[in-house]
Amino acid sequence: MKTKEVVALMNISQDTLRYYEKVGVIPPVNRDENGYRIYNDSDLNWIYLVKNLRNAGVSIESLIEFCRLAQLPKNENIQAQQKQILNKQLEELNENLKKIHDARDLLQYKIDNYDNHIAKINASDNHDDNVERLWERK
């Protein structure tokens, strides 16, 4: 598959695709006799993985290390290191998801109670009487 087809399939820019290869986030891609990149299924899997992990916030550095390890001769130690990288990234993603869920829950709470809160403020002369202790609400 040629670069333009990969770009369309994966919904990424040519610059991003070239950058991934340049920095080592994906393994080197084979080229045809004219020097054009030819992507195989393995390359597409790497691009798909990298795109999704980047969207999830995984660092370029972690992806470079993961790819570097993948290109070494296979042994249990290398595979354990790769799995460790993935586990660490999953932990970080779960922490970020918790923060996002907490923020979403707070926003939903504020939206659900907004009219009532505004009514209390409008009915009172002192705004401080109506300060809600959001950090205690759980």
Regions found by a protein language model. Name each.
Residues 34-41:
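Minor-groove-contacting beta-hairpin "wing" of winged helix-turn-helix DNA-binding domains
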Residues 2-5, 27, 41-138:
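Arg/Lys-rich, alpha-helical DNA-contact motif
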Residues 27-34:
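Beta-hairpin "wing" of winged helix-turn-helix
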Residues 20, 33, 66:
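Residue-level "edge-of-site" marker
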Residues 24:
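Glycine-centered, phosphate/nucleic-acid-interacting loop/turn motifs that mediate DNA/RNA or nucleotide
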Residues 1-13:
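Polyanion-binding surface elements
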